[in-house]
């Protein structure tokens, strides 16, 4: 990183706690299980506790040096299991960073600046399996499993005041479409879900900085944000800052999709400074190593890239193993052909050599590599539809069925798997995608890009996809990959990233509410209560984006006095429905009658006024 001071400048905002918030840590059964959450203090003295993905960056007591990386959360747990070993690891090459000349001054400078981020890699001892799935199937509850159980519950106690009305709870009960969501998440439930393959805990043993999280149909819906440099834009500083910015607003995982130079070094900075799981698409870096010529790719180059990234600590790999030679012709009559970058790379290789996809052919060998580091599979949908016209066609579902077969192959070695999904799908076809995935992929977690429900809104595809994301999240998708306003148009900047994340946090939340996930609606009720009581600052602070909520309010009512006013700019002081409703309640309370009786009394009073005024609908106004 060639400008640490620039990075510090970029990071200034992301180190501040969100308004009225403080970091709290909920302890587990052993001293080193400390699960971070965000506590939002309200002006009425009540506290709301919410899931927090921001890591130590919003903890003012945390000392962070990005040149050294974050402190380790999991190292003691990994070492105590006694099934891993440290080893020298592969030697980084200039080609890993997209450079042909190992003596390049820029490369040397990059390596010096990243020296504090280097770690000795670990791997499974000979004959051992270090995956969370293997432990789960062996009946072992790991600290990671206990950690995510605590995290998923979000400190249930504060929610009770909002969930105690039995009539309301019955009326608002969700529909989980066959999911099995318990009222309280226990470590044993987490273990069982991971053992069954219905959930994954992406946590490479070489990413000890990660704060464990779980992805599965029976847990909170998660969201992923994409970052990454390209050959034409962005720097390492910008990508690391974008990582921290993404986590601040709620990204549960982040994918590094870098395709330009300095890929390896950028990944060092990202992994060592990330408390959330990091995913990659290894074929992107492998392609850089062969000068961008897909036909020159080989299994040996791809295998070396997998090991390189596993040693660095990547938590999940997107691999396009389902793009088989026999399926490529199915895309010939599509409106938009093959739109997946990784899918098109593998399709081109298959056609050029007229051979089966080497990722598919070497799948078991690849699984052996992932097993040694506990890297999870994210089986890529290389034949996903790139337009509504191509949704749910045979190319898409032929690949999906193959991914289901590969899932079972991976499970034979206890390697964790999630399945990637579309894409572009009209609303009336969204549920069929979830139904087909559950059937073909044996309930492995589904991870979808949207889907976008219409193709007519470039510049607003965060909205077109947010609609599909909310729907498919309700139907059972475990993680939603965000889409920004720049989708199809360009690389997103930090503002686009924030808009995309907030859009998808909304989609994930409404899906959880619709599924009837225990307790999630309590935050809605807390904000509604604050709104009804005109606690403006609490409204802002309880929202997903306090800054924007406050700014929008202040555009029309900027004075501090407006933040205690019992009205807003929409209706004004005389026509505020909530103010009128409160006045009815106050009237009833002072007279010792019910609200219904107060309303009836008011109606009788107004009726008498109408009669005394002559009983006419329109009363002429006398000239002054």
Swiss-Prot record:
Q: For the region Disordered, what residue ranges are annotated?
A: 75-99
- This protein's GO CC annotations: cytosol
Can you tell me where the transmembrane regions are? none
Name the reaction it catalyses: 5-amino-1-(5-phospho-beta-D-ribosyl)imidazole + S-adenosyl-L-methionine = 4-amino-2-methyl-5-(phosphooxymethyl)pyrimidine + CO + 5'-deoxyadenosine + formate + L-methionine + 3 H(+)
* Pathway where it operates: Cofactor biosynthesis; thiamine diphosphate biosynthesis
Q: Which residues bind [4Fe-4S] cluster?
A: 568, 571, 576
Q: Give the protein's cofactors.
A: [4Fe-4S] cluster
How is the subunit organization of this protein annotated in UniProt?
Answer: Homodimer.
Q: Which PANTHER family match?
A: PHOSPHOMETHYLPYRIMIDINE SYNTHASE, CHLOROPLASTIC (PTHR30557:SF1), THIAMINE BIOSYNTHESIS PROTEIN THIC (PTHR30557)
> What job does the chain carry out?
Catalyzes the synthesis of the hydroxymethylpyrimidine phosphate (HMP-P) moiety of thiamine from aminoimidazole ribotide (AIR) in a radical S-adenosyl-L-methionine (SAM)-dependent reaction.
Write down what this protein is called.
Answer: Phosphomethylpyrimidine synthase
Native source organism of the sequence: Albidiferax ferrireducens (strain ATCC BAA-621 / DSM 15236 / T118)
Q: What is the lineage of its organism?
A: Bacteria, Pseudomonadati, Pseudomonadota, Betaproteobacteria, Burkholderiales
């Amino acid at each position: 990183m060639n400008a640490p001071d620039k990075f510090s400048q970029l990071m200034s905002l992301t180190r501040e706690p969100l308004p009225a918030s403080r970091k709290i840590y909920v302890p587990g059964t052993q001293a080193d299980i400390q699960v971070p959450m965000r506590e939002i203090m309200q002006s009425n003295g009540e506290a709301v506790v919410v899931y927090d993905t921001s890591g130590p960056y919003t903890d003012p007591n945390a000392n962070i040096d990005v040149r050294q990386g974050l402190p380790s959360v999991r190292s003691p747990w990994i070492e105590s299991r006694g099934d891993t070993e440290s080893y020298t690891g592969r030697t980084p090459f200039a080609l890993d960073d997209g450079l042909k000349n190992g003596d390049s001054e820029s490369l040397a400078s990059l390596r010096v600046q990243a020296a504090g981020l280097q770690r000795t890699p670990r791997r499974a001892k000979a004959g051992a399996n270090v995956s969370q799935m293997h432990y789960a199937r062996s009946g072992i509850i790991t600290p990671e499993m206990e950690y995510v159980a605590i995290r998923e519950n979000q400190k249930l106690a504060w929610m009770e005041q909002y969930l105690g009305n039995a009539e309301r709870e019955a009326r608002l009960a969700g529909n989980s479409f066959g999911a099995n969501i318990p009222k309280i998440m226990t470590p044993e439930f987490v273990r069982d879900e991971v053992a069954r393959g219905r959930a994954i805990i992406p946590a490479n043993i070489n990413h000890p900085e990660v704060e464990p999280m779980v992805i599965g149909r029976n847990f909170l819906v998660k969201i992923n944000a994409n970052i990454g440099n390209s050959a034409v834009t962005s720097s390492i500083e910008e990508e690391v800052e974008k990582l921290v910015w993404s986590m601040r607003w709620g990204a549960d995982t982040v994918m590094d999709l870098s395709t330009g130079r300095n890929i390896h070094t950028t990944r060092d900075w990202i992994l060592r400074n990330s408390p959330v799981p990091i995913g990659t698409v290894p074929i992107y870096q492998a392609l850089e190593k062969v000068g961008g010529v897909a036909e020159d790719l080989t299994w040996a180059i791809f295998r070396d890239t997998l090991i390189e990234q596993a040693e660095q600590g990547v938590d999940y790999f997107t691999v396009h193993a389902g793009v088989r030679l026999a399926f490529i012709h199915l895309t010939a009559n599509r409106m938009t052909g093959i739109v997946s970058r990784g899918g098109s790379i593998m399709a081109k290789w298959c056609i050029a050599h007229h051979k089966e996809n080497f990722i598919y052919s070497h799948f078991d060998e690849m699984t052996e590599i992932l097993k040694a580091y506990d890297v999870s599979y994210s089986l890529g949908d290389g034949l996903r539809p790139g337009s509504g016209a191509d949704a749910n066609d045979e190319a898409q579902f032929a690949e999906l069925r193959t991914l289901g077969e590969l899932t079972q192959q991976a499970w034979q070695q206890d390697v964790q798997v999630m399945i990637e999904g579309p894409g572009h799908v009209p609303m009336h076809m969204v549920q069929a995608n979830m139904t087909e995935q559950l059937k073909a992929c044996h309930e492995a977690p589904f991870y979808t890009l949207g889907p976008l429900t219409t193709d007519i809104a470039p510049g607003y595809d965060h909205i077109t996809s947010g609609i599909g994301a909310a729907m498919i999240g309700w139907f059972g998708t475990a993680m939603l990959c965000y889409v920004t306003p720049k989708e199809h148009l360009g690389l997103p900047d930090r503002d686009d990233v924030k808009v995309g994340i907030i859009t998808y946090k909304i989609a994930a939340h409404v899906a959880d509410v619709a599924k009837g996930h225990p307790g999630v609606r309590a935050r809605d009720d807390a904000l509604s209560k604050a709104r009804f009581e005109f606690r403006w600052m609490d409204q802002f602070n309880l929202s997903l984006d306090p800054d924007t909520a406050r700014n929008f309010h202040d555009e029309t009512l900027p004075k501090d006095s407006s933040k205690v006013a019992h009205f807003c700019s929409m209706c004004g002081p005389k026509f505020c429905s909530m103010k009128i409703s409160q006045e009815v309640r106050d009237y009833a309370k002072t007279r010792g009658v019910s609200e219904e009786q107060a309303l009836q009394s008011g109606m009788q009073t107004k009726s008498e006024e109408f009669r005394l005024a002559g009983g006419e609908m329109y009363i002429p106004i006398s000239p002054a």
